[in-house]
């Protein structure tokens, strides 16, 4: 069995491209949940400021949740489908060039490894061995930065975005509906700001940035959204709309 550490002290770290892909998916999920929290919170707080009717608040919240989740899913599907089409076109071009001009492609791969600091002889040997093992994958990864067997699935991206948005949107919706009428808005604001602080901290840690600044940005943004919609709801209530 291989030791899990190098020299008994340094644990192996995940270097595979799949790890970075999983991090990107997790970060996108956090951002999707954040969108659901902010947009739904703004909507239900605005409606609750205009009326205390539970059915009206519930209907507005469910409508906003559904529209937001579908919008996220459609947008993500279109975006990822376009990206995948472009990646497939690049991969098809690379496969064609490997069949038509293999010597040129080998020289190109050699140059890539020379640019990374390998000596000409070593770069040539690496290029030849990788080409002999799996020429298409070697060239796709080195030249295009793509793994032909791990292209993003647009349906998976759409479903993940919709689920993340829905989970985020459920928090302010439940927070506005469950408490007594007089406590609805304060409880919702508190729950939303705490949730935004959590998502801001998680996204900052995933991205390696300062969590304090990230939390402040997202919390202030969410507070501003709720303040604006609360003001609009109050104006609608006063005007009798």
Model-predicted segments: where are they?
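Small-residue-rich segments of transmembrane alpha-helices in multi-pass membrane proteins
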Residues: 217-230
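Transmembrane alpha-helical segments and their cytosolic interface motifs
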Residues: 22-44, 148-174
């Amino acid at each position: 069995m291989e030791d899990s550490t190098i020299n008994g002290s340094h644990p192996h770290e995940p270097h595979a491209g799949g790890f970075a892909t999983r991090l990107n998916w997790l970060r996108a999920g956090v951002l999707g949940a954040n969108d659901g929290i902010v947009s739904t919170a703004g909507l239900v707080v605005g409606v609750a400021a205009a009326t205390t009717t539970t059915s009206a608040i519930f209907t507005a919240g469910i409508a906003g949740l559904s529209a937001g989740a579908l919008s996220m899913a459609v947008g993500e599907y279109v975006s990822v489908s376009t990206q995948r089409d472009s990646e497939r076109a690049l991969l098809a071009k690379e496969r064609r060039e490997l069949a038509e001009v293999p010597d040129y492609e080998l020289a190109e791969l050699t140059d890539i490894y020379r640019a990374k600091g390998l000596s000409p002889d070593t770069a040539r040997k690496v290029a030849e061995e990788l080409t002999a093992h799996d020429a298409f994958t070697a060239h796709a990864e080195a030249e295009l930065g793509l793994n032909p067997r791990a292209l993003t699935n647009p349906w998976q991206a759409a479903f993940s975005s919709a689920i993340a948005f829905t989970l985020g949107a459920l928090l302010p919706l439940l927070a506005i509906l469950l408490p007594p009428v007089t406590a609805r808005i304060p409880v919702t604001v508190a729950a939303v700001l705490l949730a935004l602080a959590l998502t801001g901290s998680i996204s900052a840690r995933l991205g390696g940035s300062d969590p304090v600044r990230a939390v402040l940005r997202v919390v202030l943004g969410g507070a501003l959204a709720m303040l604006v919609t609360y003001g609009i709801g109050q104006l609608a209530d006063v005007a009798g709309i």
